[in-house]
Amino acid sequence: MTVLYLRVNLIASLDGTEKKTMTPQTSRAVSQAPSPLLRQTVGSIAVLTLDSPSTRNALSEAMIMALQSALDSIRDDKSVRAVVIAANGPAYSSGHNLKELTARRSDADKGRAYFAHMMKSCSDMMQTIVRLPKPVVAAVQGVATAAGCQMVATCDLAVASDQATFGTPGIDIGLFCSTPMVALTRNVPRKHAMHMLLTGDHIPAQRALELGLVNSVVPAGSEREAAIALADRIAVKSAYTLKVGKEAFYRQAEMSLADAYTYAAQVMTENMMARDAQEGIGAFIEKRDPKWEDR
């Protein structure tokens, strides 16, 4: 099993713009700001770890950019077959960095343009998770609130520590969790989602499991290993079939029943013509393990 650690860095260029790069963790240049995100390769699994415990792994501008950069690089990387998003420290993610946002109220427009930029950047990153042609599993070890809870809901699957908690407490500070609401209402029954949004109450891991926000709850300290094991189980499947299936899953969910069946029938017909479907069906009939070509 190959294990490789990388740190996703944002390097300031001479013209003041930022360039996204992937550099070895051990060779950080003096000009590089410490990255809030680590990337670890475990076999065919890319493990992205939020690594800013001092900010409770807030989804700061740097964190969002690092996640976006990492996900973009993974998209066409054939060596990566699944992704795990984990975190270091006591919190999974506390959501947006409120101090960072508040600091922009001194802008001429009182921060409006920056706030719009941040909300769009975060929303784009969340949609990248959904559209990534590879399964993404959250490994939640602690508190996941606001946009942090949103990211858990956005991931295809989620494994939680029995000490993890989840909430959308924006209502308590006069800021309704509108963008987290999008992911939450698509993964949790509506009245329960509304309860979380209106009260700001945190729910424990077991309740999150009952509501469908997470797939499993494991003893504290084993959530990362469990998430990697789950991702590994999926990674042995045909990458082509996983790509087709994930895209179809999210697209049909937005359609009417009739349109969804029409679309799904078309997808399944095309899938039947794929080399891996021929191989998989043949292997099943011949009682042997399939040899995927990912096409």
Model region roles, listed by residue range:
Residues 48, 52, 67, 85, ...:
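Terminal peptide-recognition signature
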Residues 8-88, 127:
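Conserved CoA-thioester-binding segment of acyl-CoA-metabolizing enzymes
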Residues 70, 121-132:
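Catalytic-core regions built around general acid/base machinery
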Residues 87-125, 144, 256:
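Glycine- (often His-adjacent) and acidic-residue-rich active-site loop
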Residues 3-5, 9-43, 200-206, 221-225, ...:
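C-terminal alpha-helix plus adjacent terminal tail
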Residues 127-242, 274, 279-282, 288:
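Crotonase-fold acyl-CoA enzyme core
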Residues 63-66, 118-121, 223, 264:
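Hydrophobic alpha-helical membrane-association signature
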